[in-house]
């Protein structure tokens, strides 16, 4: 299953849709415009919140908590690195490998590739594709993409 994310370049409220390979809306992502620290909400096609992404305000490096059903499901932490951005996902079997800076990387589950994320260049606004090989937790894959993209855009 493939998911396509198209962020609108002039979207003040940072709301964008996530479509499946057939063009159907699967999710909507909404960034809280004036919140400090920055937060995102992911809604399914029935407009029910499935995940929230909340930044830890007092941390040395960027850290986001992924919250599902009121519980912290995972934390994504940008690790200190001199050359290329590196991310650690705590509390989850997922890890990130590849060229995150170029928005071309692989998501691994317990060391085995389960999805790839790539950015389409030269498009109006940011466009991404998540290629989910085995039907993994697509909400978590989407959350990983959103956090990494947001942190990279702030560096």
Predicted regions and their residues:
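Intrinsically disordered, low-complexity proline/glycine-rich segments
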Residues: 1-155
């Amino acid at each position: 299953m493939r998911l396509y994310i198209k962020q609108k370049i002039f979207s003040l409220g940072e709301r964008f849709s996530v479509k499946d390979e057939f063009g159907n809306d699967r999710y909507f992502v909404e960034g809280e415009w004036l919140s400090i620290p920055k937060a995102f909400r992911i809604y399914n096609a029935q407009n029910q919140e499935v995940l929230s992404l909340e930044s830890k305000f007092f941390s040395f490096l960027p850290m986001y908590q992924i919250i599902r059903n009121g519980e912290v499901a995972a934390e994504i932490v940008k690790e200190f690195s001199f050359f290329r951005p590196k991310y650690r996902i705590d509390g989850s079997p997922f890890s990130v490998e590849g060229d995150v800076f170029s928005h071309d990387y692989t998501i691994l589950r317990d060391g085995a590739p389960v999805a790839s994320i790539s950015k389409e260049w030269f498009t109006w606004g940011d466009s991404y594709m998540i290629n989910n090989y085995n039907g993994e937790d697509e909400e978590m894959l989407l959350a990983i993409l959103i956090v990494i993209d947001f942190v990279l855009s702030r560096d």
